[in-house]
């Protein structure tokens, strides 16, 4: 996290995209769409305890989250998989869903600043 309380780390991405603002903007627009879809899928499939579709959503966002050093997303996703496997109570699933909703919303806001 940098001094502005941002959670997205664009430094690696900037290097990969040759520090080209147009490329970064294009990537950010696509990532906004990906994180919006993931945020919705995460909550839906977690609360339904639909492990198959939950894992598909996680695998789809994982490379983007890694590129942006978003370990908190990866960690919460792994935690939520355990909640499903261990058949934890719904309130724990809801807490994870709400946490991921907040994280993804902040990520989307930060990405939109780059568009």
Where is each model-derived feature located?
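Two-component system phosphorelay core
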Residues: 1-56, 60-62, 66-115
